[in-house]
Amino acid sequence: MIDSLDVSYGDMWGSHEGPTHPNPIPNALAARRHEAGMAYAVLLSSRERPLAMVERWPRGMWRVYLFDDATRRVRMIDFKPFGTGMLLAHRNTRLTGGDEETSTVEVLSCRAPEFGDWQVFAPFLAQQGHEPAPTVVLNDVSVDEGAGPLRPTGIEQLFVPGPRDTPDGPAVVELGDAGAVRITSGRLAVSDPGWVSEPRTVTVPPGEYPVTLALLRRTPWLRVAAAKVTLLDAPPHAWEMALRPDEDPELLGEGEFYGVGVDTGTVAFLDATRTVSEEALDEEVFLPLSFDDRPGVELPGTETEPNLIAFSAGWGDGSYPVWIGRTEDGQACCVVVDLRLYPSDEEKQVPGGPKPSHA
């Protein structure tokens, strides 16, 4: 009979298989995500053996996975809101070697849990042959609160030319002039040029601003390690992550960040009002950037629209942090995209290296 469960928290598992979280998070971070209606996972274990993994989904949906003795997820129970403050178990699926077999659920409903109220799911352990005691004690074994979101360490060093040690061996940083981006609307956008409808924006005075590329050269390749728009001829006193209005850094785990999402292997600086046709992208951006000796390209403006400066995104698709450098009096003096070709000194000290991001 199971009278106690160890509780830990993490990001959603996806296709991960194993006895522990692929990316554990602290109790306090999970609680903040719960309050914000965001997704997270709860692992319920006994004697270091996983019994159930509970996933909190948007719109009040929940999912419980049950494990077998070999720590494989073999059963999946889906819950949806039912009445006031209740959940209905509407689907019970047996997972067998890639196949799914649906059966009835013996316990049809339970309370919708408040954060930490995981005893409500204990009766469902019986679906896998476990007998919970009338009262189940929960023991919090989640990881300690870490250092928080990714910090802007070493941003200035990205643009210092000279030799570098990288995970792939020695390389050299060179600086390249990518031209000047013209901003007419007062909003500088950072975006994948193929998806300019959802950019990350920074408020700047209208004008033309030089774009500098930090190029990492290691025979036989040349990659863009970072890109910078210089807004003022003044050094940054502090750095801040470029955020959308609905983004809260308090909801990020250790080493995580909100960044610009990339699906075409390309990032661009542009005015927030600029639109781009697929034909222009293919012929004037993606094709030129496909050559190794062409890391950056300008898509010229028209009579009605300003130009666009595009460049290859590090190793390709993914998400990359955007940092705003501010002077001592708070003015934005530069905007930098770190394309993450090599970890900062801070990340080298974090177990597992760079953490997941949110585009």
Where are the model-predicted features located?
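Acidic, proline/glycine-rich low-complexity IDRs
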Residues: 3, 88-155, 255-256, 260-359
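Generic structural hydrophobic/aromatic packing signal, biased to beta-strands
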Residues: 43, 53-54, 211-213, 227, ...
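Short, flexible beta-strand-to-coil junctions
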Residues: 45-47, 55-60, 79-83, 217-219, ...
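Buried hydrophobic residues that stabilize the cores of well-folded domains
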Residues: 1-135, 211
